[in-house]
Amino acid sequence: MPAVEGKYHTYAEDTTQEALKASRNHRAFGGFSLGSVTTWLQFCYDYDYIRYFLPMSGSCWYYGTYGDFQIERNVDFIENLVKEQNLDQRGYFIYHAVGTNDNVKSQSIDMADEMLSRSTFTPDHYVFYQKDGGYHDLDAVQEYLYNALPLFFGGENT
C-alpha cells in the first residue's frame, strides 16, 4: 500500500500505518479463484487497512491448502475475528460471489451456507451472490465487480 498511496492521490494523508488505518473506509480488495483465497486472507490479516472485500469463486484457506474442507473451522476463525476486533462497529463488508456453473462453486457455497447460518454475518456485513449460469470466467468476474463496487463505494457504506 505505501508504494501506491505514496505516489498517487488517495484518501490516506501519508503512508504511515496510522494514516493507512484511518483511510480504510476507502479501500477494497478482491480476487478471483486463487485470488479469492488471497482476499479471504487479506480479511484475516489486514482488516485494519481494508474495509471492503470481494472474494470471487473461492473460500478461505486460513487453515491450509484447500481450506474448503475445513469450512466450519475457517468460519469460526472469521467469526471470532469479527467479534474480537469489533469489526461490526468499525465496519466491514464482504461481497462473496460464484457462478452456478462454476467448477469450484462448492467451495464458495459451502462457506456461504456456514456463514449465513450464523447471526454474526448479517446482510449489512456479508452478502453471497450466485450468478445464474455463471462459469469460472471473466464474464462472471465483470458482473461481480459491477454489482459489488457500488455497494462498496456508492455512498451509504462509505
Which residues are covered by each model-predicted region?
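Non-catalytic cap/lid and distal C-terminal segments of serine-dependent acyl enzymes
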Residues: 1-158
